[in-house]
């Protein structure tokens, strides 16, 4: 819960910052925060410390998914951007399903702390790739609004019905996805008696469905 709160609220700050100073600097800072948060979780000795570092981790983790959309918008025309965003949506839809599978595999060879060490390592790799990324928002296209002026635009978005309909659609998907992720182990293993070693296979079937539907959506767009 702490991670999701930090993940959602921090985007409201990183968005205006990236519009003002470009994409690469916020992306670099975000990945550094993610790495520090992951190491903090891996070295925690109490649940309070884990929650704190998970929130800290989320402050950086949100930057990648958010700025990837902005960088696509910067780099492509409307039609191609829509197709590319559809591909990105497929990746982001599969991630919440694939994550528990990978985490479960890591737990078979180590403790829960190994998961966070792996996350820190992946963060280091991603940080290295930033040096090969071009800056997609040139200086001439950057906003000169103050942060508080940008925040005022959020209220305008909340009053826009078309925008809110899309928000509700995405919200409905993630509510259902996380409800399934948290509740399916009990239903499969406890209620239906599915052996634990087969649960991962059943859980992985969702990835196939999400991939096929997202690929279809990309063609329709």
Model regions: which residues?
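Juxtamembrane intracellular "pre-TM" segments in multi-pass secondary transporters
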Residues: 136-167
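Helix-loop-helix hairpin linking two adjacent transmembrane segments in secondary transporters
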Residues: 49, 78, 86-131
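Transmembrane alpha-helices of Major Facilitator/SLC transporters
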Residues: 199-221
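Conserved MFS/SLC helix-loop-helix module at the cytosolic interface between two early adjacent transmembrane helices
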Residues: 8-48
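Residue-level signature of mid-helix packing/kink "hotspots" within the transmembrane helices
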Residues: 4-12, 96-97, 207-211, 215
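Interfacial helix-cap and linker-helix signal at transmembrane-aqueous boundaries
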Residues: 17-18, 102-110, 188-189, 220-221
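Extracytoplasmic gate region of multi-pass secondary transporters
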Residues: 162-203
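Cytoplasmic helix-loop-helix junction between adjacent transmembrane helices
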Residues: 47, 53-94
């Amino acid at each position: 819960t702490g991670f999701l709160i930090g993940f959602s609220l921090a985007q409201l700050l990183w968005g205006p910052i990236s519009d003002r100073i470009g994409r690469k600097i916020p992306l670099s800072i975000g990945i550094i925060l993610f790495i520090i948060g992951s190491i903090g979780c891996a070295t925690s000795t109490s649940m309070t410390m884990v929650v704190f570092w998970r929130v800290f981790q989320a402050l950086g983790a949100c930057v990648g998914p958010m700025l990837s959309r902005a960088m696509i918008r910067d780099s492509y025309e409307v039609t191609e951007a829509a197709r590319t965003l559809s591909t990105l949506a497929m990746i982001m839809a599969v991630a919440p399903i694939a994550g528990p599978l990978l985490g479960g595999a890591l737990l078979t060879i180590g403790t829960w702390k190994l998961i966070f060490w792996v996350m820190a390592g992946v963060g280091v790799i991603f940080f290295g790739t930033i040096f090969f990324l071009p800056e997609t928002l040139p200086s001439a296209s950057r906003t000169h609004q103050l942060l508080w002026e940008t925040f005022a635009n959020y209220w305008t978005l909340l009053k826009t019905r078309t925008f809110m309909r899309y928000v509700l659609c995405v919200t409905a998907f993630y509510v259902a996805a996380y409800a399934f992720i948290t509740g399916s182990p009990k239903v499969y293993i406890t209620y239906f008696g599915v052996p634990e070693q087969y649960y991962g296979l059943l859980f992985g079937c969702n990835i196939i469905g999400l991939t096929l539907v997202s690929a279809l959506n990309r063609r329709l767009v």
